[in-house]
């Protein structure tokens, strides 16, 4: 069933496919603060209950997009005359929707990852070239002020030529566990966390370094989210899902769908339409993605990167250290210091605590002031939306196209291939035939930048820099 939408502003027209939680970032933007810049004219989903709920939420803001079943995707594009499609469906469906939209002559905005396998990367880029349209990947992490500032510092030459990066990301047992409940828990659906989650991180590294990876070797294992852990915690009587689990009250990684209005209305209330359970047991034997991963990368500009991702840490955050020939840049963020011990939902999160410190090779360290930001993902979501919908400048080149999306996903895809062969190195060129690289970055990433003079007065971020003392360890 569909009813042709009536645009509210005559602006660019958007259709949205895939109506899980993440879709509401875009739905609420186009029915709220960004509605003057774009009309939401179509909604599409495989679950009619989720579809009805999204229509209802839009109607509360007097926006009435047409509703379409997943099988009516092309009809939605024709009838709504959408200019662009926003793809927020499960990862394994991205390539299909992106290619179909491009063939229909539409631009595409897609959630990360671009897709989950190398063949689909090639397919998307070929379709984009043939169509002459544009694909944008929603890499919101680029937009957070702290990560943008890191890019500016590196580009300034403050630490000279970059030689190595250490990157550690910690997901806690609230956020991390969620990937083991949902469709992400199967490699064929998500590519595992090295694709679904780490595509953010590999994109940041690519963007910060102005390069792409040449070779990857990796190791992955399931160390925590497995039956043995549940047995060790005394959860011998665990069930298939949290809602019907005899061990629910004793499990510290349980999920109560009824405690969240959004989860209740989007998922629990609509299970009867497709049998999808949002709260499957995180310790189930059929899970085949890893919760502990490391990767060693060598980049085309000869930077070496060590990467570590764990999904069961006591707190959540990350630490990145850039080693350069003139010093180091360290960025450290605490997103959530701990998880409630009784398994209850986390309390409202405090603002992210982020520090950005430059340690010159000779001299005292200084801490940079990070511009304030509002909203999720370090303020990245709000800034990304303002740029995506066309009313904010992008002087730092944060917008990511399908090439950037492919080359970040390919790192995770190559890492998975390495793990499957016992850690053997995998050359990305063997996977990337036909996948163009993003536009190259200029100096300071070449050797000529290693010992050039750093003129602090040229860079606004130095105006509020504060010298600090760092104790030796």
Regions found by a protein language model. Give the residues of each.
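Beta-strand-loop-alpha-helix segment that lines the small-molecule cofactor/substrate pocket
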Residues: 5, 79, 84, 90-91, ...
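Conserved SAM-binding strand-loop segment of SAM-dependent methyltransferases
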Residues: 65-72
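N-terminal Rossmann-like dinucleotide-binding module
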Residues: 1-62
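C-terminal helical cap and adjacent loop that interface with cofactors, partners, or active-site loops
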Residues: 8, 25, 289-473
């Amino acid at each position: 069933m569909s009813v042709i939408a009536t645009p509210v502003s005559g602006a660019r027209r958007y259709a949205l496919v895939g109506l899980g939680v993440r879709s509401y970032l875009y739905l609420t933007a186009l029915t709220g603060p960004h509605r003057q810049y774009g009309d939401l004219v179509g909604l599409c989903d495989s679950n009619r209950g989720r579809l009805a709920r999204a229509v209802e939420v839009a109607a509360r803001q007097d926006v009435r997009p047409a509703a379409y079943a997943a099988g009516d995707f092309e009809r939605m594009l024709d009838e709504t005359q959408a200019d662009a499609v926003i793809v927020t469906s499960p990862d394994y469906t991205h390539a299909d929707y992106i290619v179909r939209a491009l063939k229909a002559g539409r631009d595409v905005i897609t959630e990360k990852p671009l897709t989950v396998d190398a063949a689909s990367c090639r397919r998307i880029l070929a379709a984009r070239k043939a169509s002459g349209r544009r694909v944008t990947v929603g890499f919101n992490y680029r937009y957070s002020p702290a990560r943008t500032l890191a890019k500016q510092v590196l580009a300034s030459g403050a630490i000279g030529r970059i030689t190595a990066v250490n990157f550690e990301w910690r997901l806690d047992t609230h956020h991390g566990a969620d990937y083991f409940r949902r469709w992400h828990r199967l490699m064929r659906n998500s590519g595992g966390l090295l694709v679904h989650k780490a595509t953010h991180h590999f994109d940041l590294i690519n963007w910060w370094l102005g390069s792409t990876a040449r070779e990857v070797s990796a190791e992955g294992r399931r160390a925590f989210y497995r039956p043995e852990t549940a047995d060790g915690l005394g959860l011998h009587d665990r069930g298939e899902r949290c809602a019907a689990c005899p061990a629910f009250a004793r499990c510290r990684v349980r999920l109560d769908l009824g405690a969240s209005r959004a989860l209740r209305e989007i998922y629990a209330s609509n299970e009867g339409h497709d049998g999808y359970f949002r709260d499957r047991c995180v310790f189930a034997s059929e899970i085949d993605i890893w919760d502990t991963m490391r990767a060693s990368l060598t980049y085309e500009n000869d930077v070496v990167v060590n990467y570590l991702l764990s999904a069961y840490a006591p707190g959540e955050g990350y630490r990145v250290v850039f080693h350069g020939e003139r010093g180091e840049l360290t960025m450290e963020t605490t997103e959530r210091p701990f998880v409630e011990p009784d398994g209850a939902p986390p309390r409202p999160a405090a603002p992210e605590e982020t520090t950005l410190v430059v340690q010159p090779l000779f001299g005292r360290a200084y801490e940079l002031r990070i511009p304030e930001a509002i909203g999720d993902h370090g303020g990245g979501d709000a800034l990304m939306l303002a740029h995506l919908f066309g009313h904010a400048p992008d002087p730092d080149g944060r917008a990511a196209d399908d090439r950037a999306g492919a080359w970040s996903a390919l790192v995770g895809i190559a890492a998975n291939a390495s793990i499957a062969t016992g850690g053997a190195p995998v050359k990305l060129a063997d996977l990337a035939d036909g996948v163009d690289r993003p536009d190259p970055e200029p100096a300071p990433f070449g050797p000529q930048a290693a010992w050039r003079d750093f003129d602090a007065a040229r860079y606004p971020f130095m105006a509020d820099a504060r010298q600090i003392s760092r104790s030796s360890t």
